[in-house]
Amino acid sequence: MSSAVSASPQAASPQQDRTSGLSARYARALYELADERKQLDEVVSEMAALGRLFAEDPSLRRLIASRSIDAREAGRAMEQVLASQGVSDLVRNFIGTAIANRRLADLPSLVAGFAVYVAEKRGVVAADIASAHPLTDTQRAQLTARLAEAGYGRVTIRETVDPSLLGGLTVRIGSKLYDTSLKSRLQRLRHVMKGAA
């Protein structure tokens, strides 16, 4: 576990940087408006529910990813989804603005960006952990302790299982990626062996 924090961070790709900047702008605008209207807790809860919905509903992911759907059709479809979730006018307007600005495909990253922005404002750091197998409670506690030692005091861990990693894990905090997966180790070994041949 200790190597997860001591590995060299890798920079985010230009696409991630663009999306992160976009997400941050949208997140800041929604946060400030929700705070001003004294609806922050409600909006945080609704955006978290939308994030779970985007992650769990394959038909919604297909709608979002489709390049062939007209913005008006997408807006109507998303309005139905939002109505079924009972979200506030503030969140409806936020999603509607994103769609009107041709950001339908970016909705999951905008929702995730809002969660990151809220966590930062509250002094909590989000760590995205991908592992080949689900983490045990002991591993989770060790990882949290190692992250605290590395200067990430209050950490919220978001876990995903990615069998393609083969073993080990990756930890992404902001734009830093700590990769101790067996997959990346094998790729580095393959690269070194090609250079020696």
Curated annotation (Swiss-Prot):
Transmembrane segments: none
MF term (GO), any: proton-transporting ATP synthase activity, rotational mechanism
Biased composition (Low complexity): 1-16
Signal peptide extent: none
Region (Disordered) location: 1-20
Membrane topology category: Peripheral membrane protein
Gene3D superfamilies linked to this entry: N-terminal domain of the delta subunit of the F1F0-ATP synthase
Alphabetized PROSITE patterns for the sequence: ATPASE_DELTA (PS00389)
Ion transport is among the record's keywords: yes
Sorted UniProt keywords: ATP synthesis, Cell inner membrane, Cell membrane, CF(1), Hydrogen ion transport, Ion transport, Membrane, Transport
Compartments reported by the entry: Cell inner membrane
Complex and partners: F-type ATPases have 2 components, F(1) - the catalytic core - and F(0) - the membrane proton channel. F(1) has five subunits: alpha(3), beta(3), gamma(1), delta(1), epsilon(1). F(0) has three main subunits: a(1), b(2) and c(10-14). The alpha and beta chains form an alternating ring which encloses part of the gamma chain. F(1) is attached to F(0) by a central stalk formed by the gamma and epsilon chains, while a peripheral stalk is formed by the delta and b chains.
Family, as annotated: Belongs to the ATPase delta chain family.
PANTHER family, alphabetized: ATP SYNTHASE DELTA CHAIN
Function field: F(1)F(0) ATP synthase produces ATP from ADP in the presence of a proton or sodium gradient. F-type ATPases consist of two structural domains, F(1) containing the extramembraneous catalytic core and F(0) containing the membrane proton channel, linked together by a central stalk and a peripheral stalk. During catalysis, ATP synthesis in the catalytic domain of F(1) is coupled via a rotary mechanism of the central stalk subunits to proton translocation.
Protein name: ATP synthase subunit delta
